[in-house]
Amino acid sequence: EKGLSFDETMVDLDNKENKLLNYGSICLSEKVPCLQINDNFTLFESLAITEFLENKFINNGFENIYPVDICGRAICCAIQSVVKTDFLQIKKEMPSITVFERQQHNPNWSTDLEKEINRLIRLAEFYIKEQWIAEKWSIADFDLSFMLNRLIQNQIVVPEKLMDYVERNWQRHSIQSWLAVRNSK
């Protein structure tokens, strides 16, 4: 989104590449993602990484990925945090891979999953204003749309407002570019 050039190295979590010594020597937490700048600075946790990039590359002609307005920024950070730390049943029964690859539809969702789906939909309907969470698009919009897309790709019916929101996010140039790179590997 900011138009920064970078190199991406894929880490195979299924094969626990993040637990191998070569990755652990770069990122002591063994967490993914990890941002490495030169050989002497690494940062893990996506929220910390996006906050760092926003603050380092602000007012230099780069697009903002968070609202400038302090209230809008706080709400976006809260949304990112809840998407990252909550909705564990959704993440368990509808893993990220289901967003990219069609999986066998499971009509027998757990009761806990149904509760989480309803809570996610309520949260999204409340915080998504006309188009975005804040006045303009932010990285929190993508994080929320990614979680909502888990539902959509698993054939969960969501309100049209949320379908449109997910579609708007996934049609952004930066997201389409990321998907193209991801699909080429």
PLM feature spans:
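GST-like domain detector, emphasizing the conserved glutathione-binding G-site
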Residues: 1-107
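A local structural micro-motif
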Residues: 7, 159, 177-178
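GST-like fold's C-terminal all-alpha helical module
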Residues: 83-171
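Exported/periplasmic ABC-transporter solute-binding proteins
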Residues: 181-182
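Conserved histidine-centered catalytic loops in small-molecule metabolism enzymes
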Residues: 185
